[in-house]
A protein has these predicted regions:
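N-terminal, Lys/Arg-enriched amphipathic/low-complexity engagement segments
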Residues: 34-90, 99
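Hydrophobic residues within beta-strands of alpha/beta enzymes
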Residues: 199, 263, 291, 313-315
Length: 482
């Protein structure tokens, strides 16, 4: 298959999804309605929250879900599956329901980002791809949001395509970084596909191509006078790079009345060099010249150099963002929460572990976020059984699901149900917002979190509480199965 030929991603699944599905088919469970939750157990980098991303690619996948003739032939050659099961797969389509938290929403451990209600085989076969999408893009969106917050209002561009772990990681990573708050990307195809504004300056090769740095700068400035950012560290930033940039700005831009321009540094002591460069530019009258920096940046380095007085207007953040280098795995999991029995009753299911953090919250659930009416800040998230409702005109007592004696009465609040319907009976019912709308929503929602929750180090725990009914069901199942 050529690299430009569209892949049928239905077969992008762990092989045991197929062997289990075959078992469900042969043992009479193929039509049994099941409920699965996709959630994660801890925030990356020890942070206080994560950012949901990846839903749009899941929607596209579900809509195109089918097994091709080649897929069926491959599975037949494995000599593991019955002809009846292969015939079922040949006519396979998704007929279930999916609810999800919208992209850009701050999310917390142990709460369902996605809930699937579908026949057992349908729900099982989509597990791998759902996790792939959410785990990758939520990881990058979360890292991007940390970087953007560290930059304290300065522009942040995603610069990591060449260091990404594959083409999809570069393309979708740029999308996720934009959701998390980045202002644009260097990845051209992400602009073409998603509208993530692509931009860039020059590489050192441009400067080296000419006989002198001055000639390289002048040629570039003459070509792009309205968008001129010069890379000043090819030879010597302060002795030649910045002086040559100022000379070219004076010769090319000043006669045209253009005052907006830029320089970029990709090496050296960013705090020291940007302070000196800013002084030189200002003394030459180029006070509107922006200073951009790159070079293995992350949120901690950005924080440090800004504390040291760095004079920077724009950060280009590459490998440590696009690979989430400090913690390159988002631990999303997909677990069975309930099944429907022969009498049509929803029966809760639980997964128990010696590791308390791996014990699941059972049942088909609703997820609420309580927002204080007086502060506009998030108070807590609240999980309850599907047939419960929250009346936010009434006070409600919430409690720590582990340290149950820690209780709090919430009043003067608005209860917002976080999950929204995406598919109903296999039909798409959700209208996806534009990427710029998702980014705006993300920044607005992050602003509803208290600063204590947003700390990079030792953030305050944000609680995801259980209703009394859900807690009773969970601990009843623990007693029954322990």
């Amino acid at each position: 298959m050529g690299t430009n030929e569209k892949l049928n991603l239905t077969m992008l699944c762990d092989f045991y999804e197929l062997t289990m599905s075959h078992g469900y088919f042969e043992k009479g469970y193929r039509d049994r309605i099941t409920y699965f939750d996709l959630f994660f157990r801890r925030c990356p980098d020890g942070g206080g929250f994560a950012i949901a991303a990846g839903l749009e690619q899941i929607i596209e996948y579900i809509q195109d879900l089918h097994f091709s003739a080649d897929d069926i032939d491959y599975l037949r050659e494995r000599n593991l599956f019955s002809e009846e099961f292969l015939e079922y797969l040949a006519n396979f389509k998704f007929t279930g329901d999916i609810w999800a938290v919208p992209e850009g929403t701050p999310i917390f451990p142990q709460e369902p980002i996605i809930t699937v209600r579908a026949p057992a085989i349908e729900a099982q076969l989509i597990e791998t791809f759902l996790l792939l999408c959410i785990n990758h893009q939520s990881l990058i969106a979360t890292k991007a949001n940390r970087v953007v917050r560290a930059a304290q209002g300065r522009t942040v561009l995603e610069f990591g395509s060449r260091r990404a772990q594959g083409a999809d990681a570069a393309i979708l990573g740029a999308r996720a970084a934009y959701i998390g708050g980045c202002h644009g990307t260097a990845c051209t195809i992400s602009d073409q596909l998603f509208g993530v504004h692509a931009g860039g300056t020059m590489a050192h090769a441009w400067v080296q191509m000419f006989d002198t740095e001055y000639e390289a700068f002048k040629a570039y400035c003459e070509m792009y006078p309205e968008n001129c950012t010069l890379l000043v560290d090819t030879y010597n930033t302060l002795k030649s790079g910045v002086p040559n940039a100022i000379r070219v700005f004076n010769e090319v831009l000043k006669p045209k009345g253009i005052t907006k321009c830029g320089i970029r540094l990709d090496s050296g002591d960013m705090a020291y060099l940007t302070r000196k460069a800013r002084q030189m530019l200002d003394e030459a009258g180029w006070t509107e010249c922006q200073i951009s920096v790159s070079n293995s940046l992350d949120e901690y380095i950005i924080q440090d150099i800004l504390r040291q007085g760095a004079q920077i207007d724009l950060f280009g953040v590459g490998e440590r963002l696009i690979t989430a280098r400090s913690e390159p795995v988002f631990g999303g999991v997909y677990k069975l929460a309930a099944v429907v029995n022969e009498d049509g009753e929803v029966v809760p299911k639980i997964k128990i572990s010696e590791n308390v953090g791996k014990i699941t919250n059972p049942h088909f659930k609703k997820l609420y976020r309580f927002i204080g009416n007086d502060t506009g800040k998030a108070i807590a998230d609240y999980l309850c059984v599907y047939d419960e409702t929250v009346d936010d005109s009434q006070d409600i007592e919430i409690f720590d699901p582990e340290a149950t004696w820690k209780r709090k009465t919430v009043y003067n609040y608005t209860a917002k149900e976080l999950q929204v319907p995406i598919f109903q009976s296999g039909k798409l019912v959700y209208k996806s917002p534009s990427l710029s709308e998702i980014r705006k929503y993300c920044l607005e929602q992050v602003d509803t979190l208290w600063d204590e929750v947003k700390r990079f180090d030792n953030p305050q725990t944000y609680y995801v509480d259980l209703s009394q009914k859900l807690w009773d069901i969970k601990y009843g199942l623990l007693k029954k199965n322990s």
